[in-house]
A protein has these predicted regions:
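RNase H-like nuclease fold core
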Residues: 1-77, 82, 86, 91-94, ...
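Short, charged, low-complexity patches
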Residues: 55-58, 113, 117, 206, ...
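Conserved, well-ordered core segments of regulatory domains
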Residues: 1-17, 21, 88, 97-102, ...
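Acidic/histidine-rich catalytic cores and adjacent linkers
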Residues: 129-251
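General alpha-helical segment detector with a strong preference for membrane-spanning helices
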Residues: 16, 83-84, 107, 190, ...
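Hydrophobic/aromatic-lined pockets within catalytic cores
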Residues: 66, 70, 89-93, 109, ...
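Conserved beta-strand -> loop -> alpha-helix junction used to position metal-binding or nucleic-acid-contacting
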Residues: 48, 75-82, 87-125
Length: 251
């Protein structure tokens, strides 16, 4: 069973290729990593499914977390995979949902010219260092106004999701960088990428993939994740106070 209370859950999907009957097929690894009230990270779910990333598989992952005992989460951090935001909100209605800022910055390079993208990045860095949500909201609106003519459709989408790009500003300063991206999941993805390259660019079977996932998870949980990062250690009392305040009010 899982701890019923978590400060944060980071979710992300990673594509890999598996060899099956002399053919390569795509699979998606659905990862969920929790940050406990003790400040330690733990892998909650790591499931490989054939085919492309899809909402039904994400529903299965989130439902599985609840079935295993998870009840209260303060903040979910995820990318803006189409349709995932309302699903996360439906399963955990009292959690903030933060959309990954790294994915946002990458998208700017797709939607804006090189010059505009550079300015977008500069303005976003200023938002990330905002004192509080109110200042961040104002700067975010100014950013959307600035690029409304260059990319009206995308700016419209950003405005609708403003609270989900700025949720990290509600939390202690030492945690804002961690809470604004899904980079925590990259600790596992990075190890898998090395294993993939060393295996010739793909995994030789589903069993091989599961075995190597287990190795990657164990090396983190038994290694560097055993010691609290400095930012987490300094912010932990405040994070737990925020957790207690929020969920006492929602009982």
């Amino acid at each position: 069973p899982l701890d019923p209370d978590l400060l944060a859950v980071f979710v992300d999907g990673k594509y890999v290729e598996l060899r099956e009957a002399d053919k390569l097929r795509s699979a998606c690894i659905y990862l969920a990593i929790g940050l406990g009230r003790d400040g330690k990270k733990r892998v909650l779910s790591c499931i490989a499914r054939p085919g492309r990333e899809n909402l039904e598989d994400w529903k299965s992952v989130l439902r599985g977390l609840i079935e295993r005992g998870l009840r209260r989460v303060m903040i979910f951090i995820q990318d803006d995979f189409s349709g995932l935001l309302p699903i996360s909100q439906s399963f955990f209605p009292n959690a903030d949902v933060q959309l990954c800022a790294v994915h946002l910055q990458r998208n700017a390079k797709t939607h804006l010219s090189k010059t505009d993208s550079a300015e977008f990045q500069q303005r976003w860095r200023a938002i990330k260092s905002s004192w509080d949500v109110e200042v961040g909201n104002r700067q975010f609106e100014e950013l959307c106004d600035r690029f409304a003519k260059a990319s009206p459709s995308w700016m419209g989408e950003l405005r609708k999701k403003r609270q989900h790009y700025l949720a990290f500003l509600k939390y202690p300063e030492p945690m804002r960088k961690s809470f604004s991206t899904t980079n925590v999941v990259e600790a596992i993805n990075g190890q898998l990428e090395i294993m993939r390259r060393n295996s010739g660019g793909y995994f030789h079977s589903e069993q091989t993939l599961k075995f190597k996932l287990g190795l990657a998870i164990s090396s983190l949980e038994d290694g560097r994740w055993r010691t609290l990062a400095r930012g987490i250690a300094s912010a932990l009392p405040q994070l737990n106070a925020l957790f207690q305040s929020r969920f006492e009010q929602t009982r």
